Amino acid sequence: IAQCLVGSEMCIRDRSMKRHFILHIGPTNSGKTYQALERLKLAQNGVYLGPLRLLALEVYEKMNDAGIPCTMLTGQECLEVSDSRITASTVEMLDCDKEYDIAVIDEAQMVADDDRGHSWTRAILGTLAGEIHICMSPVAKDVVIHLINLCHDEYEIREYERKTALKLEDKPFSFPQDVREGDAFIVFSKKSVLNIAGRLEENGIKPSVIYGSLPPEIRRRQMTLFNEKKTQVVVSTDAIGMGLNLPVRRIVFLEVEKFDGVSRRPLVISEIKQIAGRAGRFGLYDTGYVTALGQKNLNYLKNTLNIPEQDIDIVSLGFPQVLLTMDAPLDAIIKLWHEAKPSAPFRKINVDEILFLYGYAYKERYFIADFDDKYLLYKMITCPIDIKDRELVRQWLRYCMSYTSDISLDKPDKHSKYQGLMKYESYYKKLDLYYQFSVRVGKIVEDDWLENERDKTQAKIMQLLSKSKDEYIIRCRYCGRILPIGNSRNICSCLLYTSPSPRDTER
């Protein structure tokens, strides 16, 4: 455990391979990833490791369009191309036992992320490639160099400047009077995205929508509508900040606070700069603009954008699977590792969700074949699912209990307590779970059926998104009036002038 807490276990690799790192350091819209990908095109056996399925898909398409055979590999799917020279994948899919001649690790400032940062740590320490390009924000420079030095590898630095100017507007944004084509409106929940989209439609403005629970292919189609000017604006959560290439002229923060899973808090400097940096696109807009709804929010942006970002001083460390060789139950090993203190700059991932799924499975351990097989059980409890979706958790448990009964897993149940968009988004998550769990436990995936179900579900979601979003507009629960953006009480001033009926009071 002590060795694992200083990253030593993750550096165990072919020491005869001398790795050379090229660090591409710069802000958003500086061309750093473009330069790394140009080098990747020359690889005979290369890999791209990015944060999003959409970015892996973008690399996959660009490579194949350029006549370079490229396969895409993510947790949701594998698009295999014969004789491929490049693999475009999400960072979690890295095979640390496979050798490459050139690798690209994108958005490496994510190394400090509480939930996924350990995958970047693993990639930097464990990728087997003679030439590794790392693209990152300047704040990650020192900590990434620290990781490289742990492995006694060489590196060189290439720094980039932003290619388009970024300007904070003097006046606060007024909705909907100030809406312009090319705007991207930033809010921080699905509910808010659909609320704003509905308000825009009320004013004759066609929006694309992007939020986390949308299937990746739907997000891509929504982006395509905006790229092709079939929609005039975008309404998005902070998903827009992670390298998505959109022709955005202006970023409009309608909110400057977000719920982070624990509490509602103001956006931090890095979040604001990452999102604001998406404004302006080289070759299309010479200047990107940033503004906010209301003077108070604009003042917050103005003060925050002038503050230098603090360098990252932590690195996320994942659970080392080498510990599974210990002679102890799996939950005891995980808890023991969790209680141990790592050396700086490492910070261990939160294992609460892993232990939650372990506890869920433990209750049914007598019905789960090979429950004592720690390697297999670890694969099961680390299957990425939304534990807040209890339908999904129940499906996961059914798979744990029945995976040995046939060559393929049972197909997901279409029935759901949810309605509308949420029903189909939840079903799509079930399809993803069917695929991921099958791959983890070595079951045969019925690819044709899965592709057909995904296509039908995506078509239904697109159909629902193309309809009027009036039902999502947040209104006063008493008088039905549209509420001001940011109103969190779901009531307006109507109660100041009229007395609510007894029925309303009961509600």
Residue spans of the language-model regions?
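Accessory helical-bundle/CTD segments and flexible terminal tails appended to RecA-like ATPase motors
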Residues: 311-475, 482
